[in-house]
Amino acid sequence: MDQRYYSGEEIHMGDRVQFCGCPATVVFVIDRDEWPDDQSEESRDWERKENGSGFLLRQENGACIFLPEADEDLFFVSRANNAA
């Protein structure tokens, strides 16, 4: 699946976003095979098997939310290598 925000930008690991009004960061994107360096291959395989498609968000308060695809409450803010 081609993961994109409703605004059309591709979803990538490290993106800064707003989800339900709360700041968050995209931790990984299964569909693009984008993972943090410290995530084991075993963990990656489990995510692929359990979820198949989607991405994980981590909010500033530490809460993690898995989404199978973008929804109307998810807004792109900036790429990881750009200033917010």
Locations of the language-model features?
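Terminal, intrinsically disordered low-complexity segments enriched in charged/polar
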Residues: 42-43
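Short strand-coil-strand connectors
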Residues: 7, 20-22, 60
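Mixed-charge, Lys/Arg-rich low-complexity intrinsically disordered regions
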Residues: 1-13
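Intrinsically disordered, low-complexity, charged/polar segments
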Residues: 48-84
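Short beta-strand-centered aromatic/proline hotspots
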Residues: 22-37
